[in-house]
């Protein structure tokens, strides 16, 4: 064991992990190679998808409260996707962290920042729609884009605050076989005289706090908000959910499915300090459910598209319309704006991946890529039925 490992106080479960040897089974190596390929593809998809969502929603659409929520969700997912290539590298070099202690802390902090930010933002979206339906007059007077951005900044600050313990206790630990772990070491700060008790109490506190704050409480807020909205809409005789409601439901379901198993294994890991029999199960399952949580950031942009009606029938035509409407000179938008705005299917409706919900128009000649690049984010915001549909969250 290296000097680095012997000088650091370690919890019993961490000491046992440091003594585990690397595997030499051929079938397991094939699984590792497949995992590297899968994570590499997921990181590429996540970066591209969330980058497109950020650009389209932030630069090519009229800013509303709803687009503000989507913008910050995509930013959180982009951060998580940006950290995924480094996790892929960790897998590729044989499950050994070769990027140093500081980057180990930063990489893990991004994972937990995304976890808290996603839960907080989904809660805010649900409360926003609840206020729109239950307190429409108040929402009309106070629900603004500036207020939504301020709420998001507060939620980001809370997410950063909750991430601090995971930054502090993350560390690199050398294994007997020469590999390096990037993992919790809850004895880094003030271990105390009874190390076993300190390990158990701190690990339980971390697992329970993130389960409550990043998962259970957000889901409770989302469920109660949905129940309040459903009751109010039933009194109004409106039963069919709007497009944005279906989008939120899909994103929340993906959040629960991707993050739920991680929290279960995190709680099992905390229990494994006192119950060594759980440790093999945790060591086998925790890497898998951690990857599943990462993939939530890749799934969300896809859900923005798949929640639209008649997606399979319109997918091919709609994607072509999306590209042709975005790759167009700004002067063409201005010159033909008056006639094109009168059309039911305007280019503004197809200015984002969410435009699969709209009816695509026929192509209008070759795309003007250079003009679009020169226009970029400086183009004037486009308005149209898509933005009106996104803004009408209670429809």
From Swiss-Prot:
Result, substituting residue 347 to A: Decreases in PKC-induced internalization of PTGDR2
PTM characteristics: Phosphorylated.
Cytoplasmic-side segments: 57-67, 128-146, 232-247, 309-395
Subcellular location: Cell membrane
Motif (Involved in the recycling of CRTH2): 330-333
Region (Disordered), start-end ranges: 333-363
Name this protein carries in UniProt: Prostaglandin D2 receptor 2
Gene: PTGDR2
């Amino acid at each position: 064991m290296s000097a680095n490992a012997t000088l650091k106080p370690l919890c019993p479960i961490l000491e046992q992990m440091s003594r585990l040897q690397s595997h030499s089974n051929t079938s397991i190596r094939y699984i590792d190679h497949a995992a590297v390929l899968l994570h590499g593809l997921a990181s590429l998809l996540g970066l591209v998808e969330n980058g497109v969502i950020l650009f389209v929603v932030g630069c090519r659409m009229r800013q509303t409260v709803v687009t503000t929520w989507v913008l910050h969700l995509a930013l959180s997912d982009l951060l998580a996707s940006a950290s995924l290539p480094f996790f892929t590298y960790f897998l590729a070099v044989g499950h050994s962290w070769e990027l140093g202690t500081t980057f180990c802390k930063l990489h893990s902090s991004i994972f937990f920042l995304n976890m808290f930010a996603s839960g907080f933002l989904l809660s805010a979206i649900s409360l926003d729609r609840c206020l729109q339906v239950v307190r429409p007059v108040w929402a009309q007077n106070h629900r603004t884009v500036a207020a939504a951005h301020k709420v998001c900044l507060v939620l980001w600050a809370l997410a950063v605050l909750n991430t601090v313990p995971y930054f502090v206790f993350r560390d690199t630990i050398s294994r007997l076989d020469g590999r390096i772990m990037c993992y919790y070491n809850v004895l880094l700060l003030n271990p105390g005289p009874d190390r076993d008790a300190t390990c158990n109490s701190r690990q339980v506190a971390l697992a329970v706090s993130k389960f409550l704050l990043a998962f259970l409480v957000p889901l409770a807020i989302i469920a109660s908000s949905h129940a309040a909205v459903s009751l109010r809409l039933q009194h109004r005789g409106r039963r069919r959910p709007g497009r944005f409601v279906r989008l939120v439901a899909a994103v929340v379901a993906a959040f629960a499915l991707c993050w739920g198993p991680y929290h279960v294994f995190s709680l099992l890991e905390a229990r494994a300090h006192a119950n060594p029999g759980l440790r093999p199960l945790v060591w086998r399952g925790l890497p898998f459910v951690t990857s599943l949580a990462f993939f939530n950031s890749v799934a969300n942009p896809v859900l923005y598209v798949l929640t639209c009606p008649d997606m399979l029938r319109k997918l091919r035509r709609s994607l072509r319309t999306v590209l042709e409407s975005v790759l167009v000179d700004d002067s063409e938008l201005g010159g033909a704006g008056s006639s094109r705005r009168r059309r039911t299917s305007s280019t503004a409706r197809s200015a984002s991946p969410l435009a699969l919900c709209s009816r695509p128009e026929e192509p209008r000649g070759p795309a003007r890529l250079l003009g679009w690049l020169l226009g970029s984010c400086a183009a004037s915001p486009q308005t149209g039925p898509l933005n009106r549909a996104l803004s009408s969250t209670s429809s």
